[in-house]
Amino acid sequence: HESYLNALLDYIIADFRRFRKEQADDSIGAMIVCKTNPQAREMYRLWQERFGFAQHIEKEWNGQLSMVAAPMAAYGHAKPLRASLILHDEGDKLERKAYIEEYKKQQTVDVLIVNQMLLTGFDAPRLKKLYLGRSLDGHDLLQALTRVNRPYKDFKYGYVVDFVDIKE
């Protein structure tokens, strides 16, 4: 539901900005794990609405949303956060790889929005905040948690915000 996603996005944006400020490090990245691919697409659409379309890199796949948006900052406002949508059924393997590399190496993307992609085998040490909007258990949960626990600068561990009440 759009009102739920808007409230969730409000929280995530405020929390992530506060986290970066507290850590005094704008290179820190985050990942939002959505419940479904349609929810991830909607979250990404709402993200784009928040930060505008003044300047963006747009790739169209059968009329789907663009994968990376880079809006320009307005005078007197915080620098816009950039998001990338990475889904297994969006684009082809080479395109997804290019967006992942942009996140890892160029650090021009602040937040990755995913459903199932990148929860295992994804090594980006700057990823320090994980927002779980989908229930995970067992091996999948362990793999997701290890995404934020890579050594990076002075960080020894990452942080998880649990929106689905994972107990243990």
Give residue spans per PLM region:
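Conserved C-terminal RecA-like helicase domain
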Residues: 1-114
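Conserved RecA-like P-loop NTPase helicase motor core
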Residues: 75-168
